[in-house]
Amino acid sequence: MSDWNPSLYLHFAAERSRPAVELLARVPLENIEYIADLGCGPGNSTALLHQRWPAARITGIDSSPAMIAEARSALPDCLFVEADIRNWQPEQALDLIFANASLQWLPDHYELFPHLVSLLSPLGVLAVQMPDNWLEPTHVLMREVAWEQNYPDRGREPLAGVHAYYDILSEAGCEVDIWRTTYYHQMPSHQAIIDWVTATGLRPWLQDLTESEQQHFLTRYHQMLEEQYPLQENGQILLAFPRLFIVARRRE
């Protein structure tokens, strides 16, 4: 599991794209020229940006070669660059930086977010959506299984919190709109939950394990999911998935 799997990620494409659609709807920009899609993945969020601003110069950034290859194939009119978000520098100031479900993987948001604001043009917008599920059973159980089986903690850090992000971005010279939404995804089985998180949150836990160790981990994880996520009357499972949204507009 050394690289991301675009096919597995896109298995829940509609569910993963919905927050991007709702974030994009809150971006208060009309005619703009330069856009960066940070953590563009296979290009599903980039496609939304291209649909809204077809004349804009859009650059998608991702550290995964597989994701970049998939995005280039899907959107030949956009530029895609394999790079680390923290180190990438645009050639010109950006009118919009769009980051859908990517910045949660990076550390030290107290430095990262002001850095991103510095890349914006005056009145430019930083639009961010991050999963806020560190305390949800899906992610708590990952840590519990790892502890039980004596594996090191490889999960991402919790988000800084609403008040922290508001202060960080206000001090960086932005007007800030911030909100949190919990989605309830209908899942047909506990295995479907595993399929969902294997493409994202579970990757760091599994990537350094042998095939046998992965199977041992997933078997125990499945057992614990069954305890935490009861079936609905119709046999479906409701997977609560909170997400944090931020739209920060740089002052002139």
Swiss-Prot record:
Its main location: cytoplasm. It catalyses: trans-aconitate + S-adenosyl-L-methionine = (E)-3-(methoxycarbonyl)pent-2-enedioate + S-adenosyl-L-homocysteine. It is found in: Cytoplasm. InterPro entries: Methyltransf_25, SAM-dependent_MTases_sf, Trans-aconitate_MeTrfase, Trans_acon_MeTrfase_C. GO terms for molecular function: trans-aconitate 2-methyltransferase activity. GO terms for biological process: methylation. It is an enzyme of class 2 (transferase). Transmembrane segments: none annotated. Disulfide bonds: none annotated. The keyword Ligase does not apply. Its EC number is 2.1.1.144. Pfam families: Methyltransf_25 (PF13649). Keywords: Cytoplasm, Methyltransferase, S-adenosyl-L-methionine, Transferase. One of its GO terms (cellular component) is cytoplasm. Catalyzes the S-adenosylmethionine monomethyl esterification of trans-aconitate. HAMAP family: Tran_acon_Me_trans. Belongs to the methyltransferase superfamily. Tam family. This is Trans-aconitate 2-methyltransferase. The gene is tam.
